Amino acid sequence: MCIRDRAHHLLNTRQVAFIYHVKADPAAPVQSIATVSETADDVLSGAGSRYGPVAPLTGLLAALDRDAPFAVVGKPCDLSAIHNMAKHDNRINKLITHRLAMVCGGQSTAQKSREILHNAAIQEHTVTLYRHRGYGLSLIHI
């Protein structure tokens, strides 16, 4: 079962109230942001590999403040950081009932994505969708 399917299952069986993960930034699709998905459709719209820098735990405290069980999807280093945070915040082990890790090949830089755009003669501000995997590298721009 892939991570997306596992997240759908957790939501559909009401084991969690939401999934905390990253997705493409709607305002800048080459970049990524942390997000909360409450439905399978939300998870699907945010699914897909994201390469480049992202601060995946920026909204974690707000997610914990919702006081509802949830799952986190992240890189192993993100989940390790959450494990370490649990030593200082007992809500983590109570509320984060599932931690889903993906295989990580290491951190990439945003410069790699910009180089791809440059080589394709596409200006970043014209990009409306940027996918790294799942459909091959997909760029949609205006």
Q: Where in this protein do the model-derived segments appear?
A:
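Iron-sulfur-associated redox domains of electron-transfer enzymes in respiratory
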Residues: M1-H141
